Structures are given as structure tokens and as C-alpha cells.
Amino acid sequence: MYPAHLLLLLAVCVSLLGASAIPPLPLNLIQFTYLIECANKGRRTSFNYADYGCYCGIGGSGTPVDKLDRCCKTHDECYAQAEKKGCYPKLTMYNYYCGGGGPYCNSKTECQRFVCDCDVRAADCFARYPYNNKNYNINTSNRCK
């Protein structure tokens, strides 16, 4: 075996071992990221919404801090409805387009359409309401009751 092939094989093995310790990102969240950036025309990335208010990000409780946080609560509720329909919203891949008027769905199955609609409505909602930097990375144990 050539030394270059051995190096390549070693690099692949090391990267696979390292990747096994990293939790997988739910597949559809990658698509949701693109929908958010499409809807707000690149003004904010999805990372701005990953730890905003009481509902944007992992989990959620209490009263939303503003209209933008309410968008996240509504998105969580939409995903809960998708699960009741037997869908797996965080794993469901769907077809969508980013046009001049923002994102829209073009999926075939009921679950794909439902989950995509949840994500498009949330992305449009994020674009509609102002972002308050004071509501990013808040102390949820104090403010989300």
C-alpha cells in the first residue's frame, strides 16, 4: 500500500472515531436553518434563534418574552402536532424553495408537507418581528415561569 493511501485511511479512521462522540444534528434542522435565512433575507442566522427567550432552542416553558419568542412556542406546538400525526419532525426531510417572496414548500408526503409548513411559518414569523438582543441567552429559571 502506498504511504498516501495509508495516510488517507488513517485520517478517515480518526475522523470517524472523533465524530462518534459528537451528538448528531437532527437532519431537518439544517433545512430549517436555510428557511430562516431565506425568510429574513440573510439579516440573521439561525444561531441567533438557538438561545432566544423561553422557547427558542431546546425545550421551552413559561410565558414567551415577546412576539419572536411566541413564534418559537408556536413552532414547538406545531412539531408536537406533527408527532401526534405519526411524523418525526426533527428527522423529516422535505422539499422547499427560496423565492423572492420567501420560502415555500414542495413536498409529496403528508408528513413532509406538515413539517415543512411548520418550519416555513416559523421562519416567516421570525422575519416579521423585531429581534431584541436583551432576550438572547436569558436566565430562563428567572424569566420563564
Curated annotation (Swiss-Prot):
Keyword Metal-binding part of the UniProt annotation: yes
Cofactor: Ca(2+)
Molecular function via GO: calcium ion binding; calcium-dependent phospholipase A2 activity; phospholipid binding
Residues the record marks as active site: 75, 119
Subcellular compartments: Secreted
Record flagged with keyword Signal: yes
Co-factor: note: Binds 1 Ca(2+) ion.
Propeptide section residues: 22-27
EC identifiers of the protein: 3.1.1.4
Major localisation: secreted
Family: Belongs to the phospholipase A2 family. Group I subfamily. D49 sub-subfamily.
UniProt name for this protein: Basic phospholipase A2 PC16
Source organism: Laticauda laticaudata
